[in-house]
């Protein structure tokens, strides 16, 4: 790692990590010298999986794909985390216009807090543009196959989660 290397942060809740997230991660790696996947510990957002497991799932997914990136959990302001990691860019994926509205507002706030950190938006690929962690969890909760949206390892975690919730 060189002192002049461009470090990017791809933040998210990753509850769970999906093929859509992995698509953005693969593409983001081409844009920066080092990518950090920031697993957000968001106290205002109820997650199905705890931060440790979400971080572990992300680590397993990128390792399985041979992606050279770090996975680090964080809480608090994203721009503060980015600054702590010496990142110069935040990378966000966009699925639909509704994502853009929210993400554009957040990028403005982040810019006001730390103007030296830029935000890059990557549109979702056509085959992943409508995958969301919420949809995946609901489909899995109903006992349906989610293999088109997440890896086998994540599927197994969803099955375990639903067994626990159902008292099995």
UniProtKB/Swiss-Prot annotation:
Main location: cytoplasm
The protein's role, per its UniProt record: Reversibly transfers an adenylyl group from ATP to 4'-phosphopantetheine, yielding dephospho-CoA (dPCoA) and pyrophosphate.
The UniProt record lists the keyword GTP-binding: no
Pathway listed: Cofactor biosynthesis; coenzyme A biosynthesis; CoA from (R)-pantothenate: step 4/5
Localization, UniProt: Cytoplasm
Catalytic reactions on record: (R)-4'-phosphopantetheine + ATP + H(+) = 3'-dephospho-CoA + diphosphate
HAMAP family cross-referenced by the UniProt entry: PPAT_bact
Residues flagged as site, Transition state stabilizer: 21
Enzyme Commission numbers on file: 2.7.7.3
Keyword terms, alphabetized: ATP-binding, Coenzyme A biosynthesis, Cytoplasm, Magnesium, Nucleotide-binding, Nucleotidyltransferase, Transferase
Binding site for substrate: 13, 45, 78, 92
Residues annotated to bind ATP: 13-14, 21, 93-95, 103, 128-134
GO BP terms, alphabetized: coenzyme A biosynthetic process
Family: Belongs to the bacterial CoaD family.
UniProt cross-references to SUPFAM superfamilies, sorted A to Z: Nucleotidylyl transferase (SSF52374)
Entry keyword ATP-binding: yes
Subunit structure: Homohexamer.
Protein name: Phosphopantetheine adenylyltransferase
The protein's required cofactors: Mg(2+)
Primary enzyme class: transferase
Gene Ontology CC terms, in alphabetical order: cytoplasm
GO molecular function, one term: pantetheine-phosphate adenylyltransferase activity
